[in-house]
């Protein structure tokens, strides 16, 4: 929901440090060089910030949880109204549903970031977003339960479970619940929320559409522009919210303009970017708005700063409300004042009854926000804190989108006529919403994990054969070595398979062998023509091995990874170092019908610096995109560095381009990349004004020696990365380089093997 009180994400006063020459004040590197490469993003969430220590195993501790007792306590909490924050209608269900929704709803499919999986709603900026007003109170209401069960339930799990129990306590049958979300202890720094410097601004993500929304009485020129261009405006990737500080859309309409059809376009775009189709979108909006209410008792100037800007005595709570009692019937959250149904604490079909049962006319809330009131309607809606009062039916602009958009209307009318199908659709969509970033089912914990396998979970078959042993692996390695495939082909294919993994939502990776399926087998970065040759060859090896007597088998997914390891071992042997690349069998091959092509499309890399690849124009400097990809692969800066150096000399570049191949021993796992990059006998210069590709010439003769991209040269330019490159360029570094490369390579190959944890 929209909050209209904060204009910019700033604190109310500067912090003054009484001591001189401390780290609290002073100018920092980011102040001098705001565009500096964020290598620090690769070192987030270290054990130094984790009070539980590196040996803490949440999955093991969760198994000790008295889950039934926890749910009983949550059920009791729903109607245990507290004087310091009274429950609407005597039931906290609506508040906890909103808390869980807004925790999960930050997820976006573009990069897999956001979502409920880390408990990030506790930290800035999410704890202070305008859309999250009053959720600080929801988490405080949960604290006694979190305190009671301690580390047996994470905040991340508890927030979602509270939403589930809220639904159940109001008569709704949920689809299930899975635990397994592990808390982090500091804000995520890698999530791009947009570049706007004003809360509720959309001027950057839509290209100068809105400068922010601050409770206007009249439409501004920017809003008129937004409305006129609402058909064609394009939301910046990977964002999935229309304004800074919102979860999805502005409930008043695009940039505050009360236009249901324009709102529908925003809804469709933002929900699609969270991997929801039209039916799921309607089910979520209608199902969620069956419960609870919005809050806009008075204008926004009654509300104080958000939690991160609050004073010490507020103890992490924000948005202190000076209107009336500041709570209950005087609450100000979104500025809107809407209760959707006659039974806001019971599951019903009332939302659709009202949506289609009335005609609607524009009005304003007591806070001045645009909303809609039913024409010629009786006052049938209960007051949240005064049983003697009844209110007129109200709707949001974003609600009316479900009636006036033709596609949404058809779905809504179907759900109206078939309430059982509506309930099932909402249950499934809610489960998807709250579990989308958890990765494969093998990570799910608890007694309420649903048995049904869902396509969006990227299912892979269970292992149904005897796995290969050490002797088999030796025989298979020999077959691969004799297959005629080169080191470059073996390495680049394995990398293409495994490097789709995203630590954000735990999707991608080598398990499932989806490199062989659409859409991955047609991605430009995977060199489809070469890929088909490699896969055909490996299939012959697989077929021959699996034709043996007995139940022993190897999957193509396993064979691709094993073959990559063979390439690495061969390349290491060329520098006189014998290594065994770790390999653990157990991957299986998914079927095409187990693969949602549209859902996998966002995993296609726009840029992969590890393969010196950029698709189309470089909008963002490629070295920054490298950091982004390395972070998704959960790599540290040293791991990223050693992988770049190794993949270059192994010939993993897309299309066989020579940029960054600083060696005359291609296919040899040497440290030549670093030696030649740091050679002061080479002088570098851009080949064009775009500065994407550079030439390295002999400083004395001018003879061309090498070409490199921004990704290559950053390892000599950036001070932090150069320090790492110097380690691997040293005379005594060859063996360390090989062993570090093998370790980093093995990490990437096994990132999705949650079955091994």
UniProtKB/Swiss-Prot annotation:
Q: Where is this cross-link: Tryptophyl-tyrosyl-methioninium (Trp-Tyr) (with M-274)?
A: 101-248
Spell out the Basic and acidic residues composition-biased ranges. Answer: 212-231
Subunit (UniProt): Homodimer or homotetramer.
Which HAMAP family does the record match to this protein? Catal_peroxid
Cellular component, GO annotation? cytosol
Per the entry, what this protein does is: Bifunctional enzyme with both catalase and broad-spectrum peroxidase activity.
Q: What is this protein called?
A: Catalase-peroxidase
| Molecular function per GO | catalase activity; heme binding; metal ion binding
Q: Give the reaction(s) catalysed.
A: H2O2 + AH2 = A + 2 H2O; 2 H2O2 = O2 + 2 H2O
Q: Which family does it belong to?
A: Belongs to the peroxidase family. Peroxidase/catalase subfamily.
EC number(s) reported in the record: 1.11.1.21
The record describes its post-translational modification as: Formation of the three residue Trp-Tyr-Met cross-link is important for the catalase, but not the peroxidase activity of the enzyme.
Q: Note down the stretches annotated as region Disordered.
A: 210-231, 293-312
Q: Which cofactor does it need?
A: heme b
Q: How is the cofactor bound?
A: Binds 1 heme b (iron(II)-protoporphyrin IX) group per dimer.
Q: Which residues form the active site?
A: 102
* Positions with a binding annotation for heme b: 289
Q: Which UniProt keywords apply?
A: Heme, Hydrogen peroxide, Iron, Metal-binding, Oxidoreductase, Peroxidase
| Gene Ontology BP annotations | cellular response to hydrogen peroxide; hydrogen peroxide catabolic process
Q: Main EC class of this protein?
A: oxidoreductase
Site (Transition state stabilizer) at 98
* Placement of covalent cross-link Tryptophyl-tyrosyl-methioninium (Tyr-Met) (with W-101): 248-274
């Amino acid at each position: 929901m929209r909050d209209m009180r904060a204009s910019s994400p700033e604190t109310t006063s500067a912090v003054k440090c009484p001591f001189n020459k401390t780290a609290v004040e002073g100018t920092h590197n980011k102040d001098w060089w705001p565009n500096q490469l964020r290598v620090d993003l690769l070192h987030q969430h270290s054990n130094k910030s984790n009070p539980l220590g590196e040996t803490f195993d949440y999955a093991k501790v969760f198994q000790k949880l008295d889950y039934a007792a926890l749910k009983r306590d949550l059920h009791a909490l729903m109607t245990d109204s507290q004087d310091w924050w009274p429950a609407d209608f005597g039931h906290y269900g609506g508040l906890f549903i909103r808390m869980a929704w807004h925790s999960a709803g930050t997820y976006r499919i573009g990069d897999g970031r956001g979502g409920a999986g880390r408990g990030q709603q506790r930290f800035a900026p999410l704890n202070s977003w305008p859309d999250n007003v009053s959720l600080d109170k929801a988490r405080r209401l949960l604290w006694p339960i979190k305190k009671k069960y301690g580390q047996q339930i994470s905040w991340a799990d508890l927030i979602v479970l509270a939403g589930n129990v809220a639904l159940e306590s109001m008569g709704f049958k949920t689809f299930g619940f899975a635990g397994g979300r592990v808390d982090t202890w500091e804000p995520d720094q890698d999530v791009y929320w947009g570049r706007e410097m004003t809360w509720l601004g959309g001027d950057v993500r839509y290209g100068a559409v809105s400068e922010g929304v601050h409770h206007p009485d009249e439409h501004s020129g920017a809003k008129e522009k937004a409305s006129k261009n609402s058909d064609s405006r394009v939301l910046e990737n990977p964002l999935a919210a229309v304004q800074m500080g919102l979860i999805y859309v502005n409930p008043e309409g695009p940039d505050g303009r009360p236009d249901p059809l324009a709102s529908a376009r925003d809804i469709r775009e933002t929900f699609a970017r969270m991997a929801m189709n039209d039916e799921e979108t309607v089910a979520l909006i209608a199902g969620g708005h069956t419960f609870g209410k919005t809050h806009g008792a008075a204008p926004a100037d009654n509300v104080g700063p958000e939690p991160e800007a609050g004073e010490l005595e507020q103890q992490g709570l924000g948005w202190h409300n000076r209107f009336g009692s500041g709570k209950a019937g005087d609450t100000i959250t979104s500025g809107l004042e809407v209760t959707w149904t006659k039974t806001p604490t019971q599951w019903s079909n009332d939302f659709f009854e009202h949506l289609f049962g009335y005609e609607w006319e524009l009005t304003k809330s007591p806070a001045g926000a645009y909303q809609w009131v039913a024409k010629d309607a009786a006052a049938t809606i209960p007051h949240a804190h005064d049983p003697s009062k009844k209110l007129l039916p109200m709707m949001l602009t974003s609600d009316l989108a479900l009636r006036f958009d033709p596609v949404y209307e058809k779905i809504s009318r179907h759900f109206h006529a078939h309430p059982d199908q509506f309930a099932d659709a909402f249950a499934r969509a809610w489960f998807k919403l709250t579990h989308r970033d958890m990765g494969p089912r093998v990570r799910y914990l608890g007694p309420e994990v649903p048995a049904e396998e869902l396509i969006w979970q990227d299912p892979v078959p269970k292992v149904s054969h005897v796995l290969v042993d050490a002797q088999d692996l030796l025989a298979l390695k020999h077959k691969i070595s004799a297959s005629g495939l080169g080191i470059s082909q073996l390495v680049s294919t394995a990398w293409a398979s495994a490097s789709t993994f995203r630590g954000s939502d735990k999707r991608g990776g080598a398990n499932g062998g989806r490199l062989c399926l659409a859409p991955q087998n047609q991605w430009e970065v995977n060199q489809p023509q070469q890929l088909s040759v490699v896969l055909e060859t490996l299939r012959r090896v697989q077929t021959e091995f699996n034709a043996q007597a007995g139940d022993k088998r190897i999957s193509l997914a396993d064979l691709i990874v094993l073959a990559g390891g063979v390439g690495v071992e061969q390349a290491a042997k060329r520098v006189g170092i014998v290594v065994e690349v770790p390999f653990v069998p157990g991957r299986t091959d998914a079927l095409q019908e187990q693969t949602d092509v549209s859902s996998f499309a966002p995993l296609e890399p726009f840029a992969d610096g590890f393969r010196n690849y950029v698709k189309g124009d470089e909008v963002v400097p490629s070295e920054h995109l490298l950091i982004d990809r390395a972070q998704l692969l959960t790599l540290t800066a040293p791991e990223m560095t050693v992988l770049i150096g190794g993949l270059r000399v192994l010939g993993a570049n897309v299309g066989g381009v020579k940029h960054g191949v600083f060696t005359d021993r291609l296919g040899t796992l040497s440290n030549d990349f670093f030696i030649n990059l740091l050679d002061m006998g080479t002088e570098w210069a851009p080949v064009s004004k775009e500065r994407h590709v550079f030439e390295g010439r002999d400083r004395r003769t001018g003879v061309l020696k090498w070409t490199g991209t921004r990704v290559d040269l950053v390892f000599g330019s950036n001070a932090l990365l150069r320090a790492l490159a110097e380690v691997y360029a040293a005379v005594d570094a060859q063996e360390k380089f090989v062993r570090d490369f093998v370790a980093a390579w093995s990490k990437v190959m096994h990132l999705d093997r949650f079955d091994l944890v």
